[in-house]
Regions:
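N-terminal Sec-pathway targeting helices
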Residues: 1-17
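Solvent-exposed, non-transmembrane regions of membrane-associated and secreted proteins
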Residues: 20-251
């Protein structure tokens, strides 16, 4: 009996060690992935922002020039799939486009990462009525992990807009809705030219009290989509209406 107890105890100890090693490896992989995607995004930011030296009496500083001077072309020279640059919730992302799901597990710089990259729906056009962008809902708040805050009106009122920069324009979008829906219903969002689609979206937003403005046929929109975990195969969709377009001076 004592021998059996010793065997069981030893087995439990070994199992515990194995579990610890696997858990530690998983954490290490996750941290490595976080650093990888951060490095890729920082590299993109260093390219998109042209900087000049500014000298004052105390120090030499680096001054970030206005958004109309952003060098999107420099980013495209590194990754030809680059279509623009998104600024939302105090975060900034290079955005790519591909017809497959390549960027679900690939960063902007081409390195494999569970964070992926913010990417445009392969069937969208830059001049379309609704530009759809996808991003992972990371538990640490990275990528589109904080979009759920737009389900609260107070947060939306404090953070009403986000910006989209391409080689041609600097666009400002005003958030008019945040919607929880099923993955199978996302197709309703892709085409906002139809009055029936717009009515469906309005009703979905009204149900959760997160309709912050009116949808209009003929207007231009951007939809930010991520996973939503309060329902099976859920999706969170934050929709902005384009309220300002500036032609880039530095293009």
């Amino acid at each position: 009996m004592q021998r059996l107890i010793n065997i069981v105890s030893g087995g439990c100890l070994i199992l515990g060690i194995v579990i610890f090693i696997v858990a530690a490896a998983s954490v290490g992989f996750y941290v490595h992935d976080e650093r990888t995607v951060d490095a890729g995004n920082k590299r993109a930011a260093s390219m998109v922002y042209k900087t000049v030296s500014v000298h004052d009496l105390t120090a030499t500083k680096s001054e970030i020039l206005p958004e109309d001077e952003m060098d999107i072309a420099a980013m495209r020279s590194v990754n030809p799939d680059t279509v623009g640059y998104l600024k939302v919730q105090g975060k900034e992302f290079p955005v790519v486009k591909a017809v497959d799901n390549k960027y679900l597990k690939t960063g902007w710089d081409g390195k494999k990462t569970c964070y992926g990259c913010i990417f445009m729906d392969g069937y969208c056009d830059l001049d379309g009525k609704n530009i759809v962008l996808y991003g992972h809902h990371m538990k640490n708040g990275k990528m589109f992990g904080t979009l759920g805050k737009y389900m609260t009106k107070a947060y939306r009122d404090e953070n009403p807009t986000f910006k989209w920069i391409t080689e041609e324009y600097v666009d400002t979008y005003t958030v008019i809705a945040a919607i929880r829906t099923k993955a199978s219903d996302v197709s309703d969002i892709l085409d906002m030219d139809l009055k029936s689609d717009i009515e469906k979206l309005s009703e979905k937003a009204k149900e959760t009290g997160t309709l912050y403005g009116d949808f209009h046929t003929g207007k231009s929109y951007m939809s930010l989509i991520t996973c939503e975990y309060t329902k099976k195969n859920g999706r969170l969709v934050v929709i902005g209406e384009r309220t300002e377009r500036l032609e880039r001076k530095g293009k």
